[in-house]
Design a protein with these regions (language model features):
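Short catalytic-site patches enriched in acidic/histidine residues
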Residues: 1, 86-89, 95, 126-188
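A composition/biophysics-driven feature that prefers long, compositionally simple stretches
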Residues: 1-114
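Generic non-transmembrane alpha-helical segments
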Residues: 49, 76, 110-121, 134, ...
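Conserved short loop/turn motifs at secondary-structure junctions
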Residues: 61-62, 119-127
Length: 188
């Protein structure tokens, strides 16, 4: 989101400060939040949070946090020290619960079944865009969340050399290489 979204985590609790329009994404996480709308902006929400919480130190992912969020945290005195905790966050992401592993396994199965179900459509004359669209349809039919992790990359011939290619109206040709990079999500 272009609007500030910050999750503050302490040993026994967590709190989001986020735009009201993002609050449905929290879903069943059972995490408290303070929200704001575009009319008022984030300032009052961060001010409200600062009245209830103070940190002696705050770890952030230095490559991901924007100046906007850092300024809101600093200007409201939420933390006296901000440190780079990128390595800690990376380590935390490596640890998955059984439920998370099951969701990831299901997402892989959805992705594999979706591609296999349309491989017969990968033939000369079909465009990269057409194949990508069919793949998205199959991902959704097979149970992927509507928020795909990324738009499928379908790149044929010379386009296959571009790792971040967006599907075009280029038609597949007989015998040429086709790269497909795709994924599914299941329950987040």
């Amino acid at each position: 989101s272009e609007r500030p979204v910050v999750l503050f985590v302490q040993q026994e609790s967590a709190m989001f400060v986020l735009p009201e329009l993002e609050s449905p994404k929290i879903g069943d996480l059972n995490i408290d939040y303070i929200s704001y709308d575009d009319r008022e902006g984030p300032e009052p929400a961060f001010a409200k949070f600062s009245k209830s919480s103070r940190f002696s130190g705050l770890g952030v992912e230095s490559r991901l946090i924007r100046h906007l969020e850092l300024d809101l945290i600093s200007s409201h005195g939420i933390s006296s020290e901000i440190v780079d905790a990128t390595d800690i966050f990376a380590e935390l992401r490596m640890s998955k619960s059984e439920v998370e592993i099951n969701h990831m396994t299901k997402a892989v199965k959805i992705a594999e079944e979706s591609l296999v179900s349309i491989l017969d459509r990968m033939r000369a004359g079909v465009t990269e865009k057409q194949f990508a669209a069919e793949l998205v349809i199959q991902l959704l039919r097979n149970g992927s969340d509507t928020g795909l992790p990324f738009s499928p990359i379908v790149a044929s011939g010379v386009n296959a050399a571009n790792p971040h290619h967006f599907p075009t109206d280029k038609e597949f040709k007989e015998g040429e290489l086709v790269i497909v990079d795709w994924g599914a999500t299941h329950e987040g």
